[in-house]
Amino acid sequence: MIHSTAKIHPSSIIEEGAKIGENVVIGPFCIVGSDVQIGKGTTLHSHVVVKGVTTIGEDNQIFQFASIGEVNQDLKYQGEPTKTIIGHRNRIRESVTIHRGTVQGGGVTRIGDDNLLMINAHIAHDCQIGNRCILANNATLAGHVELGDFVIVGGMSAIHQFVIVGAHVMLGGGSMVSQDVPPYVMAQGNHARPFGVNIEGLKRRGFDKPTLHAIRNVYKLIYRSGKTLEEVIPEIENYAQTESAVSFFLDFFTRSTRGIIR
């Protein structure tokens, strides 16, 4: 079904069954598969391919040669009808690739709202991306990676399968990340190592001084106290009683399976 207000270039191929919403613009030489839904106000600029069971929300901007919902690169994949779900107001720049999920990984590759995926970024099967994240040019996520909200991944960085990156993390360019990264941390290198709290980013997002102070203290407990995580968690719980932002650390540690960067 194609909404009457949608504008579709005659060179594009829209397969029967695709659902194209109100005021959608599809530029030249795009291909949209039969199981694709595109929400109100989204633009496919040109040469965009959207396949598989893919849902794209409202007011997204998708630039030329992006590939969304294509067959993933997991050797176990046998053509199951897994999904790709993209939220609202994302900017997906040139040559970005986003692959559909796998049955073993939950069946969905999911991207939230208000993200910027720069040129040549790759999001593999079953990745879960939060809101307001930035992936700079050539940043690559392997399968099953999770990014919290407000994560910045520097250019030419690579994140290993199953890694969890906490909210408000900033990863410097060229980083190779093979272990989980706690919330609020800045990290860089091959392999990535922590080098402080993302203070400037937190200030821009309205974190007040008492909250920043608590986050810094938790960072010091984790990385400078010489104690194990098991030893510092009760102290983190004490901070969380008065500063709700600290609870992100506790939630993160309950889900972390790969160990944290050191």
UniProtKB/Swiss-Prot annotation:
Involved in the biosynthesis of lipid A, a phosphorylated glycolipid that anchors the lipopolysaccharide to the outer membrane of the cell. NCBIfam families: lipid_A_lpxA (TIGR01852), PRK05289.1 (NF003657). Belongs to the transferase hexapeptide repeat family. LpxA subfamily. PANTHER family: ACYL-[ACYL-CARRIER-PROTEIN]--UDP-N-ACETYLGLUCOSAMINE O-ACYLTRANSFERASE, ACYL-[ACYL-CARRIER-PROTEIN]--UDP-N-ACETYLGLUCOSAMINE O-ACYLTRANSFERASE, MITOCHONDRIAL-RELATED. GO terms for biological process: lipid A biosynthetic process. The keyword Iron does not apply. It comes from the Bacteria. It catalyses: a (3R)-hydroxyacyl-[ACP] + UDP-N-acetyl-alpha-D-glucosamine = a UDP-3-O-[(3R)-3-hydroxyacyl]-N-acetyl-alpha-D-glucosamine + holo-[ACP]. It is found in: Cytoplasm. PROSITE patterns: HEXAPEP_TRANSFERASES. Keywords: Acyltransferase, Cytoplasm, Lipid A biosynthesis, Lipid biosynthesis, Lipid metabolism, Repeat, Transferase. InterPro entries: Acetyltransf_C, Acetyltransf_C_sf, Hexapep, Hexapep_transf_CS, Lipid_A_LpxA, Trimer_LpxA-like_sf. Homotrimer. This is Acyl-[acyl-carrier-protein]--UDP-N-acetylglucosamine O-acyltransferase. GO terms for cellular component: cytoplasm; membrane. Pathway: Glycolipid biosynthesis; lipid IV(A) biosynthesis; lipid IV(A) from (3R)-3-hydroxytetradecanoyl-[acyl-carrier-protein] and UDP-N-acetyl-alpha-D-glucosamine: step 1/6. The keyword rRNA-binding does not apply.
